């Protein structure tokens, strides 16, 4: 099943994507089925409490960025406000230098869990989606940390939907294209740690909540993007994530929303 997150007449809900619209999965709302796409606002597939990203989970990628190959899963956090959906623009901030794409398979947590074994992971995962761990590479090298270089708004495109029927992640082609040219061509079979091993390791550190997003690492072939480009992340049996790249606008942007 391909699941999307939508807004309809003030309600936000998950729905099953069909040829003629979206079937609401929250039957308590009592909505007609299916709802035509033209009547819906398509939202990013998740609004996570946190985004956890695997680091150096492909041997060749670790080599290309000059990091040692880890002997156990390593991971870092990415700001939840970085999430955007398919079709929304990646905004490149002024003065950050080189900005790179990183195509990745991502998992969406379905149940609250902690301290779970690798074998128990599938029962706690809602589904899978495509992700792009956009990274300000010059800042990464300068800071030696990942918070700033990966935390900008729009630096975590995900989508176009959540695939819930994927039973095996062991051999999936992962491709990233920029302006139609293939830049990354990898396979999940080359991961150092499987998605189940990665999720289990994360769960031993922090409680995972429904909707949390886990990125499983990027294969070799990272490279720069710039305003005017189009980036596509394509994962076999999962989907195709498409985002244009634009320059971030000048000036302050804020809304007067009081603390609740």
Each model region followed by its residue ranges:
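Extended, compositionally biased flexible segments
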Residues: 2-94, 101, 260
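Catalytic-pocket segment enriched in acidic/His residues
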Residues: 18, 38-44, 61, 69, ...
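Short coil/turn connectors at secondary-structure junctions
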Residues: 47-49, 70-72, 79, 95-96, ...
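Short, conserved beta-strand element in jelly-roll/cupin
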Residues: 76, 106-111, 199-200
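Short catalytic-site patches enriched in acidic/histidine residues
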Residues: 77-91, 113-114, 154-160, 215, ...
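Residues embedded in well-ordered beta-strands
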Residues: 104-108, 129, 175
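N-terminal accessory regions of nucleic-acid-interacting proteins
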Residues: 114-128
């Amino acid at each position: 099943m391909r699941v999307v997150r939508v807004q309809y007449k003030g309600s936000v809900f998950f729905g099953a994507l069909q040829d003629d619209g979206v079937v609401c999965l929250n039957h308590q709302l009592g909505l007609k089925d299916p709802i035509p796409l033209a009547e819906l606002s398509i939202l990013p597939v998740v609004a996570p409490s946190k985004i956890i990203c695997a680091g150096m989970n492909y041997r060749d990628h670790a080599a290309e960025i000059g990091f040692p190959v880890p002997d156990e899963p390593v991971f870092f956090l990415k700001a939840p406000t970085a999430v955007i959906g398919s079709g929304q623009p990646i905004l490149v901030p002024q003065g950050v230098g080189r900005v790179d794409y990183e195509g990745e398979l991502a998992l969406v947590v379905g149940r609250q869990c902690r301290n779970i074994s690798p074998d128990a992971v599938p029962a706690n995962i809602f589904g899978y989606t495509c992700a792009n761990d956009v990274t300000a590479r010059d800042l990464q090298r300068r800071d030696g940390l990942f918070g700033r270089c990966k935390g900008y708004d729009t630096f975590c495109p995900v989508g176009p939907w959540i695939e819930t029927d994927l039973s095996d992640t062991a051999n999936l082609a992962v491709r990233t294209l920029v302006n139609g040219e293939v830049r990354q061509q990898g396979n999940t079979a080359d991961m150092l740690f499987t998605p189940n091993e990665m999720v289990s390791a994360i769960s031993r550190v922090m409680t995972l909540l429904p909707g949390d997003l886990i990125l499983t690492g990027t294969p070799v072939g990272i490279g720069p993007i710039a305003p005017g480009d189009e980036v596509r992340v394509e994962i076999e049996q999962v989907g195709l994530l498409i985002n244009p790249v634009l320059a971030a606008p000048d000036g302050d942007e804020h809304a007067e929303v009081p603390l609740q």
